Amino acid sequence: MKYKNALIHSLLVGLIAAFVILVSGWLAVKAWVVFFGWANYFLHACNMKKSFKMLLAFFVGIFIALIGTYAITYLNTIASENYELYVTAFIVFWIATILIFLEIIEDWGEFVPATFLGTVLFFASGVSLKSIIPELFIPLLIGIFAGFTTLFSRDKLTIYLNK
């Protein structure tokens, strides 16, 4: 019975993953961002209520990274060309400091990793201010929905299989 349930759950997740690829293609969004949101749904042991807080944490991180990018760009215009690496390190120091300081906010500590990952997501995706919504927000929502769907359908399937 254990192997049968595991196989059926695995097939279910495979089916959802294939559907995510199709939806990503149809909507012309980056599938890796969708999978990023989906994986983080599980990493943060989310439910629907927590998932919106996680999404907010992603966007706090994205916003901080956006401000950091503008600061790096500005400081590089006034600093000598030889100091670009040091300017970037200086700004990243402040970004990391701010992110960890967010732990003092009650009920936010568990979402600091999502905030960190939001900064990573921004820097890795190469999006601009104008493309954050279609290139990050929409795919993250799809990923969170895939995570919710996985847990919901897995729970229902487990109940059905164990009858």
Label each PLM-derived region with a short phrase:
Residues V33-T73:
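Alpha-helical membrane segments and adjacent membrane-interface helices in multi-pass membrane proteins
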Residues M1-L11:
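N-terminal membrane topogenic signal
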Residues V20-F35, I78-F93:
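Structural signature of hydrophobic alpha-helical transmembrane segments
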Residues N82, F137-K163:
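Alpha-helical transmembrane segments and their cytosolic interface
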Residues I16-S24, I64-N76, I95-E103, L121-S125, ...:
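Alpha-helical membrane-inserting segments
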Residues L85-F90, S131-G143:
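Loop-to-transmembrane alpha-helix initiation sites
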Residues S24, L75-N82, F101-W108, L129-P134:
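Membrane-interface helix caps and helix-loop-helix hairpins in membrane proteins
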Residues A28-A45, F93-L99, E103-S128:
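Pore- and pathway-forming membrane helices of multi-pass small-molecule/ion transporters and channels
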